Amino acid sequence: MDYDVLILGGGIVGCTVAYELSKYNLNIALIEKASDIAEDISLINTSVVYDGSETTNKTISEYERKGCKLIEEACKKFNVPYKKVGALRVASDDYGVFKLKEMFNSAKERGIEKISLLSKEEVIELENNINIDVKQGLYSEDVA
């Protein structure tokens, strides 16, 4: 049989590429070494969907945000659970506080709205089992 596209690997990336290309009039073959798709790295991945605040690179941040929306839409379409659980980053020294503020300001400049700096008390209220001396926290609501 003739194929227009051959995809090697049936992990999350390979399957996503196959899905997107299936929207066009193409004959697609996906080859996976395991007995089923998503059995290798995709099976044990942390499954965190970031909101674009992690990076200082504007382009990567934009792609992360677009990816978030695509993943959320795909989950709804295929009835896959998708839950925004948020991400808490903490600083225990002055340099860490500086980095959190830098990340916060960078995220705000890129239009990421659901992100906030937290005081030590707010961090402990959110995560009362934290076992380090926290100076400040950064909370991103849109991380899933």
Residue positions per predicted region:
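Short low-complexity, flexible loop/linker segments enriched in glycine and/or proline
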Residues: 44-46, 131-132
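Proline-glycine-enriched beta-turn/loop adjacent to the NAD(P) cofactor-binding site
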Residues: 11, 34, 47
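Glycine-rich FAD pyrophosphate-binding loop
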Residues: 22-44
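Dinucleotide-binding Rossmann-like beta1-alpha1 core, especially the glycine-rich loop
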Residues: 46-126
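N-terminal Rossmann-like FAD-binding beta1-loop-alpha1 element of flavoenzymes
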Residues: 3-30
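Conserved redox-cofactor binding core of oxidoreductases
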Residues: 91-96, 124-144
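Proline-centered flexible-loop/turn and helix-kink motifs
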Residues: 24-26, 76, 128
